[in-house]
Amino acid sequence: MAAENSSFVTQFILAGLTDQPGVQIPLFFLFLGFYVVTVVGNLGLITLIRLNSHLHTPMYFFLYNLSFIDFCYSSVITPKMLMSFVLKKNSISYAGCMTQLFFFLFFVVSESFILSAMAYDRYVAICNPLLYMVTMSPQVCFLLLLGVYGMGFAGAMAHTACMMGVTFCANNLVNHYMCDILPLLECACTSTYVNELVVFVVVGIDIGVPTVTIFISYALILSSIFHIDSTEGRSKAFSTCSSHIIAVSLFFGSGAFMYLKPFSLLAMNQGKVSSLFYTTVVPMLNPLIYSLRNKDVKVALKKILNKNAFS
């Protein structure tokens, strides 16, 4: 067996989002549309930032990486989910399942920390504007990004290593559209106490630390904004931060609802719907939120469109 050292199961069957035949094809086209918008939006924003020298600032450096992360983890999940709508039996090998789990967790944890890095960047820009380029130097930005991906790797390794130590017997039906922690633990035939403990500790850190960082950053930002005399300056500061607050609320709200509930009380079907927000909706909305509410991005896009129109 391919995985006999840790499991009696060599493949899993993904139950998918729903088992109702009448909605499978409509859902396929709906989520295919979501995925196309996600890919076009995030790759478009990445291209726009690379092509426009005015966007080569710390703020857009982090936004560039946010779009990269959104594109990657959406691509880890969505293609397999789409297959569940058109195949009678959507199977995935044990190795494929563990690989999907690792990369999904890597990108999701990285997203939580890139959002906190973006909040810190906005704090420095608004509260210490004169020292902004010194504080957020290329070296500092690189170290922050290294920390973001380092935490992503650590979180993914912790969960995946623990999952590979779990024994799976006859039950290989995963009540989900992807290989995620809690649905996989439902298939285990041995104690999952250690895994559940790791979920609460590691997920608590991966959600708690960024959330605290973001709350502190925005508390200081709001305090600073209220001391701005001009209405125009105050409005500009609020506009700069509002898009980030919306993205943060969607991502952390749905993630906390999925993972920080007692395992025994978790309704998995409810969890599947909740997980759609951070696996499908958030990656699709992020480029729209940051583009439609960002004057610099809209100006840069108009310049490129005008340049192409007259070339």
UniProtKB/Swiss-Prot annotation:
It is found in: Cell membrane. Expressed in the tongue and testis. Pfam families: 7tm_4 (PF13853). The keyword Transport does not apply. GO terms for biological process: G protein-coupled receptor signaling pathway; sensory perception of smell. It comes from the Eukaryota. It is a multi-pass membrane protein. GO terms for cellular component: membrane; plasma membrane. PANTHER family: OLFACTORY RECEPTOR. Odorant receptor (Potential). May be involved in taste perception. This is Olfactory receptor 8B8. The lineage of its organism: Eukaryota, Metazoa, Chordata, Craniata, Vertebrata. The gene is OR8B8.
